[in-house]
Amino acid sequence: MKGEYEAVARAGVDLQIDCPDLGMGRHIQFADLSLDEFRKMARLHIEALNHALANVPPERSRLHVCWGNYEGPHHHDVALGDIIDVLFTARPSGLSVEASNPRHAHEWRLFERVKLPPGKVLIPGVLDSTTNFIEHPDLVAERIGRYANLVGRENVVAGTDCGFGTWVGQAAVDPDIAWAKLASMAEGARRATREFF
C-alpha cells in the first residue's frame, strides 16, 4: 500500500489508516497471546505501517484505532492505557480513538497521567457510531472539553468513534440519524470552540 498512500498524499488528500488490528485484533485475532505478546505484535504492525508511510508527511495522515464497530459487550477489548505508548510510535500525527461508547468513554482520564507527544493530535470519538441516540451538542462540547483541558485545545479534533457503515448490509445507525449525529457534532464543536478559544 506504500505507493497508494503516497499517491493519496500527493493528491493533497489527508490519509486515514484504519487499524482494527491494534484494537479489535486483541480479542479477535490475537486472543491467545499475552498482553506483552500482543504489544510486541502491535509494535511490529506499526513498524510496517511507518515504513509504508515513510514518504507521507505525518501531518497529512492519521491513525484510527478501532475496537470493532459493533454493538456488543466489548468486555475483552484491550484498554487504551495498555497500548497508548505503542500507538504513539506511529508516524501519523493524528491519533483517532473510540471515546464515546460505554466501554471506552472513561479512557479520557488516561491523559491525566499520559502526556501527548509533541506533534501529535488526538481525535477522540465524541459520537458513538453504533447507536441511534443523537448526542446533544452540549455533551459533544463536554467531551471535547475533557480532552482539551488535558492535552491542550490545539491538540484536539472532534471525531466519531468509527464509521457509520462499516459492513455492507449491516448499518446499525439509520442514515438520517447518522447525518443528525454529525450535525450535533458540528454544533458541539462550535460550542467548545467558543469556550476554549
Q: Across the structure, where does each feature detected by a protein language model lie?
A:
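Domain-level signal for soluble alpha/beta catalytic cores
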Residues: 1-197
